[in-house]
């Protein structure tokens, strides 16, 4: 598709879709909680729809009523063996978390994904789940999907130190631990997003978080809840950056989730000189509205414990850095290489093709700015965040056209992205 270029100031108010991480977990926990769970504000992107369909195939009744998702949970014993393969589409979250959940079930299941998901490493969950007594393996020396899993009603608790910073691996172990008899401990390398821990407690589960160590004594039962999903900060990030780099822009981003394990991008842009104001902050619900205006920015260093708190925002932060004065260094982000694409290489190649000055490194990027961006032929490579980054970059282009291939990938997390973009350009 041909992207909008040479945009004037962006003006208006935006309500971004529901948080993808919280939406997944609301469905997963609701499916094994006892009673009727109702979810408001659920993201209806393709990834979350894959999770919903998986649980329907596992015998859970899920339907939409009055703009809410209603899940009829029957507890951990309420799942039934699927009559078909579980297709997780493009969703690594679906595959890894549901594998952890099914670890304690007395049946066998095969889990598959699309071409992109089939290239993403699964050994990171295979090893701990095998230690708990699950028969699980992937193809190509257990590394990649499809996954074949035979659950075990008699799971063993484990103490597991994560070799990488991964909320998905942590979550898979905790979901299995809810069904294991005894004490399971997960020790993180760096603190990652904690939605699973918070939502297990919200559903009546018990665990202890002590710094980087999470302790859970199982087995436990969960109780149905009413969940309101806040706006996704990872989706809001695209408008945050657009407002900062397009001269004359002023945007109000409504109802954005600001869980502290996800707000690294806000700290980074403020350090770079961004003018942002928080309105209607609700610290208990971890939700705020964010007013952003065009700002002159300077380069920075992004590394260490900050990386897990903004890992999904690094592509759009890279674009931001192309418009900042000076050099921005992103380090310790090697996990980007095993996302939907090798995001280090794809971000570098895409933005450099438009005139940016970015050098890819083994674990990040070195970005020099500011640079003028020009038209180019680009692709999402099947990665939703690459597609949205490119669409925001195109708004700065004053010479040439920007063509984007495989734009349908954006449906994964933000089905109304282009509709919202057009509205902000016209408000």
Swiss-Prot record:
Keywords: Amino-acid biosynthesis, Aromatic amino acid biosynthesis, Cytoplasm, Transferase
Enzyme class of the recorded protein, top EC level: transferase
Residues at the catalytic site: 312 (proton acceptor)
GO molecular function, one term: 3-phosphoshikimate 1-carboxyvinyltransferase activity
InterPro entries the record matches: Enolpyruvate_Tfrase_dom, Enolpyruvate_Tfrase_sf, EPSP_synthase, EPSP_synthase_CS, RNA3'P_cycl/enolpyr_Trfase_a/b
Xref: Pfam families: EPSP_synthase (PF00275)
Places the protein is found: Cytoplasm
Main location: cytoplasm
Binding site for 3-phosphoshikimate: 20-21, 25, 166, 168, 312, 339
UniProt-listed Enzyme Commission number(s): 2.5.1.19
One Gene Ontology biological process: aromatic amino acid family biosynthetic process
Catalytic activity, as annotated: 3-phosphoshikimate + phosphoenolpyruvate = 5-O-(1-carboxyvinyl)-3-phosphoshikimate + phosphate
Residues annotated as binding phosphoenolpyruvate: 20, 92, 120, 168, 343, 385
GO terms under cellular component: cytoplasm
Pathway the protein acts in: Metabolic intermediate biosynthesis; chorismate biosynthesis; chorismate from D-erythrose 4-phosphate and phosphoenolpyruvate: step 6/7
Assembly behavior: Monomer.
Function: Catalyzes the transfer of the enolpyruvyl moiety of phosphoenolpyruvate (PEP) to the 5-hydroxyl of shikimate-3-phosphate (S3P) to produce enolpyruvyl shikimate-3-phosphate and inorganic phosphate.
NCBIfam families per UniProt: aroA
Family: Belongs to the EPSP synthase family.
PANTHER family (alphabetical): AROM/DEHYDROQUINATE SYNTHASE, PENTAFUNCTIONAL AROM POLYPEPTIDE
Name of this protein: 3-phosphoshikimate 1-carboxyvinyltransferase
């Amino acid at each position: 598709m041909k992207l909008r270029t040479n945009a004037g100031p962006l003006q208006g108010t935006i309500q971004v879709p529901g948080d993808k991480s919280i939406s997944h977990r609301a469905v997963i926990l609701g499916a094994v909680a006892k009673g009727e769970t109702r979810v408001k504000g659920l993201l209806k992107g393709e990834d979350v729809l894959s999770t919903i369909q998986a649980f329907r195939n596992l015998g859970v009744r899920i339907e939409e009523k009055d703009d809410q998702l209603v899940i009829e949970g029957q507890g951990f014993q309420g799942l039934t063996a699927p009559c078909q393969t579980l297709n997780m589409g493009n969703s690594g979250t679906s595959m890894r978390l549901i594998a952890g959940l099914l670890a304690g079930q007395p049946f066998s299941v095969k889990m598959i994904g699309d071409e992109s998901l089939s290239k993403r490493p699964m050994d990171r969950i295979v090893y701990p789940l095998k230690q708990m007594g699950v028969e699980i393996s992937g193809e190509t020396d257990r590394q990649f999907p499809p996954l074949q899993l035979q659950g075990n009603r008699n799971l063993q608790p484990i103490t597991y130190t994560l070799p990488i910073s991964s909320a998905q691996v942590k979550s898979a172990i905790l979901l299995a631990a809810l069904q294991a008899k005894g004490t399971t401990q997960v020790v993180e390398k760096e603190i990652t997003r904690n939605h699973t821990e918070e939502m297990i407690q919200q559903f009546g589960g018990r665990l202890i978080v002590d710094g980087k160590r999470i302790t859970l004594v199982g087995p436990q039962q969960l109780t149905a809840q009413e969940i309101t999903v806040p706006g996704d900060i990872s989706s809001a990030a695209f408008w945050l950056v657009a407002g900062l780099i397009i001269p004359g822009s002023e945007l109000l981003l409504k109802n954005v989730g600001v869980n502290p394990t996800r707000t690294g991008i806000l700290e980074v842009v403020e350090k770079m000189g961004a003018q942002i104001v928080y309105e209607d902050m609700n610290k208990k619900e971890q939700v705020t509205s964010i007013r952003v205006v065009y700002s002159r920015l300077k380069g920075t260093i992004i590394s260490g414990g900050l990386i897990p708190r903004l890992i999904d925002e690094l592509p759009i932060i890279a674009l931001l850095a192309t418009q900042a004065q000076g050099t921005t260094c992103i380090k310790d982000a090697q996990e980007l290489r095993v996302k939907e694409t090798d995001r280090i290489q794809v971000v570098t190649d895409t933005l450099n093709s438009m005139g940016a000055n970015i050098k890819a490194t083994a674990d990040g990027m070195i970005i020099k700015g500011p640079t003028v961006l020009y038209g180019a032929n680009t692709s999402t490579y099947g990665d939703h965040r690459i597609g949205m980054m490119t669409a925001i970059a195109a708004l700065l282009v004053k010479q040439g056209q920007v063509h984007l291939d495989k734009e349908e990938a954006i449906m994964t997390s933000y089905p109304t992205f282009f509709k919202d973009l057009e509205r902000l350009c016209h408000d």
